[in-house]
Regions:
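Phosphate-binding glycine-rich/basic clefts of nucleotide- and phosphate-handling proteins
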Residues: 160-245, 280
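Helical "lid/coupling" subdomains associated with nucleotide-phosphate turnover
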Residues: 222-335
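Regulatory inter-domain linker segments that are low-complexity and enriched
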Residues: 55, 67, 325-339, 436-453
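Gly/Thr-rich phosphate-binding beta-strand-loop-beta motif of the actin/hexokinase/Hsp70
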Residues: 1-25, 29, 138-169, 186, ...
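Forkhead-associated
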Residues: 359-445, 450-452
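Active-site neighborhood for divalent-cation/phosphate handling
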Residues: 75-141, 162
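Conserved phosphate-binding loops in N-terminal lobes of ATP-dependent enzymes
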Residues: 11-101
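Acidic, glycine/GT-rich loop-and beta-edge segments that sit at the periphery of enzyme/chaperone cores
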Residues: 300-376, 382, 388
Length: 453
């Protein structure tokens, strides 16, 4: 009669008893002629039979029929039910109970349906906790923690409160920034390297494409520890080889990483020190931790494999028999706190000017106010009298503790690289600042000054 914990992230559905990882597999389903299979078996043939494969059902858990003609007799709930049943039968013994760590991409409707599926399968679910909260087992003194994890199709960023325990505050789901998005980028890069170095295109056939997919995690591990990655696949008795710089993996992923950075920076207010807590999945992505450290600042903490489920099984508060299971968004810490150096806030270049159209205005010295109505005695960037979505005093840009900071004063919002800020945010060179909705866009730039005699 053991308490087990499951982390239901479709990039790696995982169950643990607190000591061992009992199973881990991706959220993949394959409709074969003789039935439905899920997990590793479906992943192993995803490139060979793409039209028979589904991987979007955990993050789109519904009871509507699937659109694909081959799957019209099934729903996403059917696929989740089959995979959950298979996992439970593989690891559970009579009398075992299950606690669920659920990812941020699952909404209240998804969670209600998930609990219904578990009930139909006679799986005794005794607790359900936000995954980021379950993963956060210690206090980050002098800092604000954000948990970073990747699913198949998105990156999940969760900002946590630290009022005596780990507590959910708010989150951001970054679409098109998941494991499969990164895999696709890297597989295309690897294929191009084969073409250039050995005149062999591994994406020409489904069989060799599947070979690349099967080996991608091994190559990523090498890219995280060595300067170059030797790559070899054998096809029809011939070995094909290529060598890729590890930095090329990071460069190829830059658009995805930058999207994550932009969303992450919008979660922090000016003056806050980030404590970036990365899941082992996020930590395995070449250059991601270093990119976040360089562009967001603060300190980076890397979690071990299975940390979310282990953190849940050790701290779980089980529901009373007969009572309904509801989503918990707070748990006590059970590990010693760690102190974060407040000096590591930002490392990126600080802007010197804000550019509106073709007009650049310095942002050093006294605060620069932005809005539709000037105020006597203040530095003012007039955005015009009739700009929709812009307040009279919308925001201001000032230097605070050596950082360039935007502070929002509006009803309509101030947006940093497309994401609404929460009160204030630190600005960097290259940032796009949108004032209001639809509002006005401005760019933060660095102007180098030269002094001669």
């Amino acid at each position: 009669m053991t308490l087990l914990a499951a982390h239901l992230n479709d990039a790696g559905l995982l169950i643990t008893d607190g000591e061992r990882i009992l199973c881990r597999e991706p959220g993949y389903a394959l409709l074969k002629d003789d039935g439905l299979v899920t997990g590793r078996e479906a992943w192993a043939t995803a490139s060979l039979e793409p039209r028979r494969t589904k991987n979007h059902y955990w993050d789109d858990l519904r009871t509507a029929s699937l659109a694909d003609a081959r799957f019209q007799h099934l729903t996403a709930a059917d696929l989740v039910s089959r995979q959950l049943e298979t996992l439970w039968q593989r690891v559970a013994k009579p009398g075992d109970r299950l606690a669920l760590a659920v990812p941020g991409y699952m909404n209240a409707e998804n969670l209600g349906l998930l609990l219904g599926i578990a009930m139909d399968l006679d799986i005794p679910v005794v607790a359900m906790v936000d995954a980021a909260v379950a993963a956060t087992r210690r206090q980050y003194t002098n800092a604000v923690p954000v948990h970073v994890d990747l699913s198949l199709h998105s990156t999940m960023l969760t900002r946590l409160l630290q009022e005596g325990q780990a507590q959910f505050e708010r989150s951001a789901i970054v679409d098109e920034a998941g494991m499969l998005d990164l895999y696709g980028i890297w597989l295309r890069m690897i294929a191009e390297s084969f073409v250039q170095q050995s005149r062999f295109d591994p994406l020409h056939t489904a069989e060799t494409e599947q070979m690349l997919q099967d080996r991608i995690l091994d190559w990523l591990a090498i890219a995280s520890t060595r300067e170059t990655v030797p790559i070899e696949i054998e096809y029809r008795g011939i070995a094909h080889q290529a060598e890729i710089s590890s930095l090329d993996f990071v460069a190829a992923a830059t658009p995805v990483y930058q999207n994550i950075v932009s969303n992450l920076r919008a979660l922090y207010r000016a003056g806050e020190t980030p404590a970036l807590q990365l899941s082992d999945r996020a930590a395995r992505m070449p250059g991601l931790a270093d990119t976040l450290k360089a562009r967001v600042g603060g300190a980076v903490f890397l979690l071990e494999a299975g940390a979310t489920a282990r953190g849940l099984v050790q701290r779980c508060v089980e529901s009373r028999p007969g009572s309904a299971v509801t989503l918990a968004r707070h748990l006590p810490w059970d590990q010693a706190p760690v102190s974060v150096d407040v000096g590591g806030r930002e490392a990126a270049a600080q802007p010197t000017h804000v550019l509106l159209g073709n007009h650049a205005v310095p942002v050093g010295g006294a605060a620069l106010s932005l809005g539709t109505q000037t105020s006597e005695g203040e530095r003012w960037l007039d955005l015009g009298p009739d700009v929709p979505g812009v307040s009279r005093l919308h925001c201001d840009i000032s230097t605070v503790d050596g950082q360039c900071v935007v502070t929002d004063h509006s009803r309509y919002g101030t947006f940093l690289n497309g994401h609404r800020i929460d009160g204030s945010a630190v600005l960097q060179t290259g940032d796009v600042l949108r004032v209001g909705t639809p509002g006005v866009e401005l760019r933060m730039i660095y102007v180098e000054t030269t002094h001669g005699t």
